[in-house]
């Protein structure tokens, strides 16, 4: 990350963030926690399974991201999915089978899938 040294740097960073956010409009965002604990619990396997399922079903408009700790240690691996126009939903205990189910049921059909972690806070996303 670059250092912001002036007001112009700050304005440029703001524009970069706004451009990144605008590019995501209309896309499904799948954010997989890949902190050490999640990787140990199978997070990489879950992400690869979801990417495979998206490709297998020919889905477009799906963007994968990876994040560090989501603070749900008891529920690793965790996946946050944001469907266009919807609030993010976090799923826990996502193994390979559940990862595939998340794509076919939640991403493709919008149907709830077991493993939703209730959210009790408001999140600010840049």
Curated annotation (Swiss-Prot):
Annotated EC: 1.12.1.3
Presence of the UniProt keyword Oxidoreductase in the record: yes
Activity vs pH: Optimum pH is 8.
Keyword NADP on entry: yes
EC class name: oxidoreductase
Covalent S-S links between cysteines: none
Top-level taxon in the UniProt lineage: Bacteria
SUPFAM superfamilies cross-referenced by the UniProt entry: Thioredoxin-like
GO MF term list: hydrogen dehydrogenase (NADP+) activity
Catalyses which reaction(s): H2 + NADP(+) = NADPH + H(+)
Subunit architecture: Heterotetramer composed of HndA, HndB, HndC and HndD subunits. HndA and HndB could form a heterodimeric intermediate in the electron transfer between the active site of hydrogenase subunit HndD and the NADP reduction site of the reducing subunit HndC.
Listed name of the protein: NADP-reducing hydrogenase subunit HndB
Gene: hndB
């Amino acid at each position: 990350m670059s250092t912001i040294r002036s007001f112009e740097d700050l304005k440029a960073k703001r524009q970069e963030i706004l451009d990144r956010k605008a590019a995501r409009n209309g896309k499904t965002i799948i954010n997989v926690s890949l902190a050490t604990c999640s990787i140990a619990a199978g997070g990489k396997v879950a992400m690869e399974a979801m990417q495979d399922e998206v490709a297998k079903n020919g889905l477009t408009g799906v963007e994968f991201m990876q994040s560090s700790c989501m603070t749900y240690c008891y529920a690793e691996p965790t996946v946050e999915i944001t469907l266009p126009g919807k609030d993010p939903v976090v799923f826990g205990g996502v193994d390979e089978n559940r990862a595939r189910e998340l794509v076919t049921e939640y991403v493709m059909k919008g149907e709830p899938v077991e493993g939703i972690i209730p959210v009790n806070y408001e999140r600010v996303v840049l």
